[in-house]
Amino acid sequence: MKNLQCSYCGKKEPLVKRIFGGSHQAFICNECIVEFFNLLEREEENRKQKDVRSHLPKPQEIAQFLDQYVISQEKAKMALSVALYNHYKRISYPKHHHIELEKSNILLLGPSGSGKTLLAKTLARVLNIPFAMSDATALTEAGYVGEDVESILSRLLHAASFDIEKAQKGIVYIDEIDKIAKKGESVQSGRDIGGEGVQQGLLKILEGASVYVPLKGARKNSNTETVLFDTKDVLFICGGAFVGIKEERGEKRSGFLASNPSSPTQRTLRKQLLSYGMIPEFIGRIPLILELEPLNLESLVKILKEPKDSIIAQYQYLFSLDGVKLEFTDEALLAIAQKSLDEELGARGLRHILEEILMPLLFEIPSKEEVTQVSITQGFVLGNSEALILEPRREDG
């Protein structure tokens, strides 16, 4: 057949590489096939974006979800809810003319046990998106023994079951970020491979870049299988205690400080972070800085019993699997919270304390089939008395 003509664009051979024939004398060229394929891809992408938008919870709904699992830190929860909503709204809506919304990575400042990790994990649960956590203390500059920054993305890819599209819209939490502050000039230990070098290495992925990521989490080398990973839509949340940064601003904390980045409060905090050892380029890539307050006694008691998956509920479920009802008196809960407060362990210390006091019972009770109920009292928590163990009444005769 000669002089075939595309039924769609009108081009003839040899202006196009190839023309394919179909039934009813319809013909299509290779260029139109590519164009139609791209059109279908765009329509599918638009459909996915509309689907995301229709299921994207509003900030108040996100905050309500956080309230089910996270006690206290109300202002931080509000700011995080807005940040999460805006981040995924930015992803799901097409660009408007020349306006491109930049992503707002987040820095959480707060003492150990104040809820930084829990907040990050729970945010990912709101949208059921991949979540990966990394410890900054394990990171080293590329070329040195340890984990490089690409290993963070490997974890996210693994959390997404190696679905690259899902992984590229996930959340990464980097804990102990204060531990990669650069060392002082007086330190004569050679190159700062775990401090400023790591901060420099994180800059690219924080801002948004395409990097080759090892599939198995190892460092890249010539024999490592890699995949190209675009981080422009990954939300990065960094957390650190930043021990030693004192309140020098002379005003009450607002809980979230990024609403006005040029405010005296915000400027002072950023200066403190720079003095601490965070480099300007790193701080510049994290627009949203949130301060979490230390948890007080009342908050710790609430954490024990009020969240949807509270620590007390978890232990009660463990005991129920052996047919035993576990109860705590109000005084016992208060004593547990006070212990954690005295030891400055925060919410993280509650599980440690509970595990310690319940260990003898967890060891003995499964072998005592006659036990039906265990009551934990203040005296038992403080080590002054035994737990109240109830057994069914035996009938005489």
Curated annotation (Swiss-Prot):
Top-level taxonomic group: Bacteria
SUPFAM superfamilies given in the database record: Glucocorticoid receptor-like (DNA-binding domain), P-loop containing nucleoside triphosphate hydrolases
GO molecular function annotation: ATP binding; ATP hydrolysis activity; ATP-dependent protein folding chaperone; protein dimerization activity; unfolded protein binding; zinc ion binding
Binding site for Zn(2+): C6, C9, C29, C32
InterPro entries: AAA+_ATPase (IPR003593), ATP-dep_Clp_protease_ClpX (IPR050052), ATPase_AAA_core (IPR003959), Clp_ATPase_C (IPR019489), Clp_protease_ATP-bd_su_ClpX (IPR004487), ClpX_bact (IPR046425), P-loop_NTPase (IPR027417), Znf_CppX_C4 (IPR010603)
Residues the entry annotates as binding ATP: P111, S112, G113, S114, G115, K116, T117, L118
Any one Gene Ontology BP term: proteolysis involved in protein catabolic process
Chaperone among keywords: yes
Domain ClpX-type ZB residue range list: 1-48
Keyword tags: ATP-binding, Chaperone, Metal-binding, Nucleotide-binding, Zinc
Keyword flag ATP-binding: yes
Oligomeric form and interacting partners: Component of the ClpX-ClpP complex. Forms a hexameric ring that, in the presence of ATP, binds to fourteen ClpP subunits assembled into a disk-like structure with a central cavity, resembling the structure of eukaryotic proteasomes.
Main function: ATP-dependent specificity component of the Clp protease. It directs the protease to specific substrates. Can perform chaperone functions in the absence of ClpP.
HAMAP family: ClpX
Family, similarity comment: Belongs to the ClpX chaperone family.
The protein's name in its UniProt record: ATP-dependent Clp protease ATP-binding subunit ClpX 2
Organism encoding this protein: Wolinella succinogenes (strain ATCC 29543 / DSM 1740 / CCUG 13145 / JCM 31913 / LMG 7466 / NCTC 11488 / FDC 602W)
Organism ancestry: Bacteria, Pseudomonadati, Campylobacterota, Epsilonproteobacteria, Campylobacterales
Gene name of this polypeptide: clpX2
